[in-house]
Design a protein with these regions (language model features):
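Mixed-charge, low-complexity intrinsically disordered segments
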Residues: 167-206
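A mature extracytoplasmic/lumenal domain signature
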Residues: 161-165, 225-227
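Membrane-interface motif at the C-terminal end of an N-terminal transmembrane signal
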Residues: 24-38
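Core segments of small alpha/beta cavity-forming domains
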Residues: 38-147
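A short, structured loop/turn motif at beta-sheet edges
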Residues: 149-158, 214-220
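Short beta-strand edge/turn micro-motifs at domain boundaries
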Residues: 39, 207-231
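Short, surface-exposed coil-to-beta transition loops
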Residues: 140-145, 205-211
């Protein structure tokens, strides 16, 4: 009887592990508009989504949540500073932290100068030799992306994303808009995020699409360039 009980417990444990794996897959793949056909596993997808989320901002602050650039050193100064601010969750930031975070996100080849002076993103305290982040004022439209495809190559990934806005100005509903703020669809505020993504997937041609080039460097992913996908 004891042996049978142990066997049953082992079987139940296996079932729980399998179900947990399925649940994790569902959570991650719900942000995929199209499943990748390039042998990209769940862990890779999670890391890719986390990386792009770190650099995906707010168009009311930086004009574009994710601007195009052929080389990160040519990306707009404001966007780079705001990416750093988003990823350094501190009220007082040292120069070394600014430089280190920039390399963690954009790689060792970034050669942007970070002058010790104030700008739109940071105030600079000369006496303390620190940067102090300025406040960010956001509107009621959330800038969002979903991954539509991932191409895995020897050095990293080419990731295609679809960009859209979730308008929360009405408490009773969420309006899905493209980047020119044209209404594409709407859901009630009680409906899940999955329903919103279904609407986006059904209207892919009406949204902006970009390709994000990610490179593997020092056991992390760094952003190389971003291009617009032309229809």
């Amino acid at each position: 009887m004891l042996k049978w009980g142990k066997t049953l417990m082992k079987k139940m444990l296996i079932i729980i592990v399998v179900l947990a794996g399925i649940l994790i897959s569902m959570i991650i793949y719900k942000n995929m508009a199209v499943s990748s056909k390039n042998n990209v596993n769940i862990q890779e997808i999670k890391k890719i989504e986390e990386k792009i989320s770190k650099i995906y901002l707010w168009k009311e602050v930086t004009n574009e949540a994710l601007p195009e650039f052929e080389n990160v050193n040519n990306a707009t100064e404001l966007w780079i500073w705001e990416v750093l601010k988003k990823n350094i969750d501190k009220f007082e930031v040292s120069y070394d932290e600014i430089v280190q975070t920039s390399k963690e996100i954009f790689g060792q080849n970034i050669n942007k100068e970070f002058p010790k002076s104030g700008n739109v993103s940071y105030k600079y305290d000369v006496e303390k030799d620190i940067y102090i982040p300025t406040e960010v004022t956001l509107d009621q439209m959330e800038d969002v992306f979903i991954i539509s495809d991932i191409h895995k190559n020897e050095g990293g990934y080419e990731v295609e994303i679809i960009e859209y806005l979730e308008d929360y100005s009405n408490e009773q509903k969420v309006v899905i808009r493209n980047l020119v703020e044209e209404e594409i669809g709407q859901v009630s505020s009680s409906e899940s995020e999955t329903k919103i993504k279904e609407i986006v997937k059904e209207n892919v041609s009406r949204f902006n699409k970009k390709k994000v080039f990610l490179k593997k460097e020092d056991n992390r992913l760094i952003v190389q360039k971003v291009t617009k996908i032309q229809e």
